[in-house]
Amino acid sequence: MAVPVLIIGAGIIGCAIARELSARGVHVQIIDDRPVAGGATQASAGILAPYIEAHDRGLLLDLGVRSLALYDDWIAAVSGDAGVPIEYRRPGTLEIALDADHAADLRRATSGGNPQWLDRDATCALEPALGSIEGALFVTTHGYVAAPELTAALARAAEHHGATFRRSRAERIERVSSHLRVVTASGAIDADRVVLAAGSWTGALAGDRWAAAPVRPVRGQLLQLGWQGPPVTRILWGPECYIVPRADGSLLVGATVEDVGFDERATAAGVRDLLDAACELLPQGWGATFMNVRVGLRPATPDDLPLVGEGETEGLVYATGHYRNGVLLAPLTARLVADLIVEGKRDPALEMLAPGRFASRT
């Protein structure tokens, strides 16, 4: 018997969709050859900052703002379903200017979010550990969530509503009579609908020409440091790195942007570059404890917008290509996909996110 919905991918997007669908009464199975949050999600700092990620007005900013507005209620609901706390804070971001030219650019940034320009003295009064800077753009609505922790909670919440998880590697998707068949390393699974949330591996699985080409892996390395200096309380965003203060006192420093294919190695060069950038912002960083480095392959598209919506193959739905914004866009993506599958409702945004938008280019 075919399962109603099979989701390929147990990262934050796949697990968010699984929880949303199962909470609406849909029987869902999720497959991945890695553990929950075992891919790009485990190397995410979980930043929720649409006004930095998309300074210029456009669809990405609109999507980010919509999704951020869902976060408070979403986290409360997921935590309640899963029965576990989730580290989630909204301390704001300080986008740091190190020189006068960058400061002038930031002063002109008026893309919403109630940004406030702070001069050097005002910025350093908020964050005394900062080094030599010109000032910062302060957005109070921004925050972060512990992405692996959230994804584990989403999986647990989905299971609470009846979803099942299976560790297996999906190899291809086929159309068989009235349903889809996903061939895995441990056998075939038939499904009425398949949601492809496989991130950088989308092209190898897609099964139709629409999305086989556009999604490419971009390596991101993320450091965790044991901070020994004055407390850092807000997210710092510099020209070459960002720094996220965690509840345990450690700092996450990210992230490299490397077009190296499917190479998931941590590198000396990546670690060095991030440490140099972090210590330019926080000079006492050289005295921090090096705790670990994580690596993830972020799924990017040519226009930096995700692929969300129906594929060329009947019954196939895409939810992939979120690049640096998977955590930010997770609640909105889950809602868009669930509305499409359960109610047949097509949000206007899906037209711009359609997987077929690159078909004429490939």
Question: Which residues does each PLM region occupy?
Answer:
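Helix-loop-beta segment of a Rossmann-like dinucleotide-binding subdomain
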Residues: 84-95, 114-161, 256-260, 320
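Active-site substrate-recognition segment that forms the wall
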Residues: 16-24, 33, 46-47, 84-89, ...
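N-terminal Rossmann-like FAD-binding beta1-loop-alpha1 element of flavoenzymes
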Residues: 3-29
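Dinucleotide-binding Rossmann-like beta1-alpha1 core, especially the glycine-rich loop
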Residues: 46-126, 277-279
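C-terminal catalytic lobe of FAD-dependent flavoproteins
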Residues: 147, 284-362
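Helical element adjacent to the flavin cofactor pocket in flavoenzyme catalytic cores
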Residues: 137-193
